[in-house]
UniProtKB/Swiss-Prot annotation:
UniProt source species: Arabidopsis thaliana (Mouse-ear cress)
Gene Ontology cellular component terms for the protein in this record: mitochondrial membrane
UniProt-annotated location(s): Mitochondrion membrane
Top-level taxon in the UniProt lineage: Eukaryota
Residue stretches in coiled coil: 152-181
TM segment ranges: 4-24, 28-48, 62-82
Name the record gives this protein: Uncharacterized mitochondrial protein AtMg01090
Length: 262
């Protein structure tokens, strides 16, 4: 029984330490302590009023719960006092340093050594700033790169390479489909009796007609170009008529309205 009481006290101290360590000043604020104290007093009063109705085993468990709550409250109270004492010490140190500086300056005026006192104070401040900055620089330079940070950087680089490779593969496949449409267009025009002065006009006109299709999302681009190549030259392909317009715009007068697809 006594060992269990000691164990619960240690467990409460560990829980309170967790609050103070990871939750900061919010875990030991004055409001939280007051709320916890009210709950503790309420638990004690409730236990005293119901003690006569409880059995022996239930009474022992209630005692243990109260010991745990009291230990937790005492540790939180200790953390709150230490935090307040640290703030008070910092304020006292600041006031002391300010008083010391004012006292030193006034003594210099009385002794007609104002310049020497001012120079001494400025020199000391510069020395403190230089030492602080040099300490920060040396610590940042000598600090090794964390292993986790290097691993994350390598993982991001690998992911970037993988995405770049996938994009390059999709782009290459779409370019092949576009080249297949150029060959298909040349065959269809030849079947309809169209002879172009410059065979490269087919490629130029088709690239102009397919300009907006390259703006499709990368995930849907290959499938979109596959459908275009399959339906190219038919009424189901909405890029054939713009292709004819571009051919005519390039000066191919053999291409006329009868080559459009309804």
């Amino acid at each position: 029984m006594y060992l269990l009481i000691v164990f619960l006290s240690m467990l409460s101290s560990s829980v309170a330490g967790f609050f103070g360590r990871f939750l900061g000043s919010e875990s030991v604020s004055r409001f939280n302590l007051i709320i916890f104290l009210i709950l503790l007093v309420f638990s004690i009063c409730l236990f005293r009023s119901l003690k006569q109705y409880l059995g022996k085993r239930m009474t022992q468990w209630c005692y243990l719960a109260l010991v745990c709550q009291i230990s937790l409250f005492l540790v939180l109270l200790r953390s709150h006092i230490l935090a307040g004492f640290g703030t008070f010490s910092a304020d006292v140190f600041t006031v002391f340093m300010g008083t010391f500086s004012v006292t030193g300056s006034s003594g210099g005026i009385v002794n007609h050594q104002d310049g020497a006192s001012s120079e001494w104070f400025t020199y000391t401040s510069d020395m403190v700033e230089d030492s602080a900055s040099s300490g920060r620089t040396s610590s940042s330079v000598n600090q090794p790169i964390p292993e986790e940070q290097a691993w994350e950087r390598e993982a991001r680089a690998q992911e970037h390479d993988r995405i770049s490779a996938e994009v390059e593969t999709i782009t290459s496949a779409c370019e092949n489909l576009e080249a297949a449409m150029v060959r298909k267009a040349q065959i269809l025009l030849h079947q309809r009796g169209v002879t172009l002065g410059d065979p490269e006009d087919v490629k130029r006109a088709l690239q102009l007609a397919l300009h907006d299709d390259w703006e499709h999302a990368i995930d849907d681009r290959k499938r979109h170009f596959t459908v275009l190549r399959r339906n190219f030259g038919t009424a189901r392909c909405e890029r054939w008529n713009p292709f004819i317009d571009e051919l005519r715009g390039l000066g191919n007068h053999q291409v006329n309205a009868r080559h459009y697809v309804d």
